[in-house]
UniProtKB/Swiss-Prot annotation:
Domain of life assignment: Eukaryota
Location of the motif EAR: 170-176
InterPro entries, alphabetized: SPEAR (IPR040356)
Stretches with biased composition (Polar residues): 144-167
Organism: Arabidopsis thaliana
Protein name as annotated: Protein SPEAR1
Record carries keyword Heme: no
Organs and tissues of expression: Not detected in leaves.
Amino acid sequence: MGSTFFGRPNVVGSSPPSSSPTSSSSSPATRRGKKNGSEKPKQPQRGLGVAQLEKIRLHGEMSCNSFNSYNPSLYPQEDVRMQGGYSSIPSQSSAPYGFYPNMMMGVHRDQYDRATMSWNPSYGILESQHSLEPNITRHFLNEDPSSTTRRSKSLGSGIQHSGSSENQEVDLELRLSL
């Protein structure tokens, strides 16, 4: 009795409730329930807005700084900031923040090989590390350890060398001081 359905609702009531004429009054109620459910995500969720605004702000700064590389005389204070000193924070991949590692900001073509960009998530800034004289670094890496001991004695450091571990500490101090 009403087991086949060809497009016309069965009035007897054995058909599914969505096709009966009496269920049409309950369909706005279910729609109304869906409206209430869809309104909840429209309310701002805490914490997401700040992160999104920060991301937009950083993208805006990157756009300004990439323009800065074409006209370096427009923003001299930006050039000074980008040529800052060394940082002890290692380089990290910045792809999760929407930045690309090969994108250089405010760095001229002749400085391309000497600049390292790194993202520091704890401070929320993009840091640049410039090696102004890369030959000095290479010189220390290839240097004989006995010559560094002679240099530390000639500098008058006053440290007595009793073992190889102290020599390594002195070498680290010399590298950091330069």
